[in-house]
Amino acid sequence: PNNPFSGLFGGLGHGICDIDTNSLMPMKNGDIVPVTISGVTKGQKGASGELRGYFSSNQAIGNLFINSDEGVYGQLDVSPVEQQALPVAMKQEVKEGPAQILTTVADGEPQYYNVTIESIEYKNSSRVKNLVVLVTDEVLLEKTGGIVQGMSGSPIIQNGKIVGAVTHVFFNDPTRGYGIFAENMVENLVSIEQETVQKAS
């Protein structure tokens, strides 16, 4: 989710963790730079796949200043998707059934792929595993085997609204993964915006 007025945005839907300890990595700030997705390691049962890519520029387009359990948050200098902005759905608007994810897979541009929202958990103690998503799109299944590392933060879209973002893949079934409610990420953005205003005043 991105606020077109302030440039504040949230990404990933989960935190960036230390690979050895699995603990959240501390972060003061960081640059946001463009990347190009150049290849895919296909996911299969018991072996997570991944997107491969490289930094396509060293010119920062924004900065990150929060790494939390529910994603990374920062501010963009210019919105890359301002003309394609979609409204955010409240969690009660999300329904089981057909949806799409918007993701980039080794061909340069983000594409829509069909998925099914299999289940919705409103009371889950984890705020990042609210939805179970099944990839049904034959093109995406052929390219990636389903959900792979690097797809975190891919928007989940239903009825013209952003309902969530992909957060995790099922280790034993790469066609399935979890998603976070977009509303949860927006709540975090609102808190960040309020803190920013308070600091400024």
Segments (PLM) and residue ranges:
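C-terminal recognition in membrane/secretory proteostasis and scaffolding
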Residues: 1-201
